[in-house]
């Protein structure tokens, strides 16, 4: 059985949520209203708590001292409720992704180069999380890693500084690199790969 057979279950979606959320790129439209309401309550309690904690202990009133403990307990309870609501939401999303009828809704976007068409997926939670998990699966399975131009330049500068020889640097680019990849051969290879799960193949 493929190691990615369970890649669209709750745990995988939760990992995807944490990865995106840590970067501050988690959009509200992909989360449930109930979860968002609890998260807002938590932020308000955190704001009130910080307002009290900024005061020195000697300057706090008895009411404020009591409020600190109260807020901490309420925030702890709220965090548990958030976790439950998020689990319920992601479990439902997972079930819809794993259904046989689920597909990405691709919409063509305007492109400056007709040879480089652009497409966007639908704005649903199912499509967002499915794409996150699919991309992660492909990166892990095929060890896909794209270095940024800044990282490449830094490495190049380091190498040139270590060697005092004279060099000429020529910058080149492959025209329409990704567009030139024969898709029929690529999909044939993916279809025959036993490590890639059936769901990922169907989404591709």
Predicted feature residues:
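Conserved two-metal-ion catalytic palm core of "right-hand" nucleic acid polymerases
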Residues: 1-200
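Short alpha-helical scaffolding segments that buttress acidic/His motifs in well-ordered protein cores
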Residues: 202-204
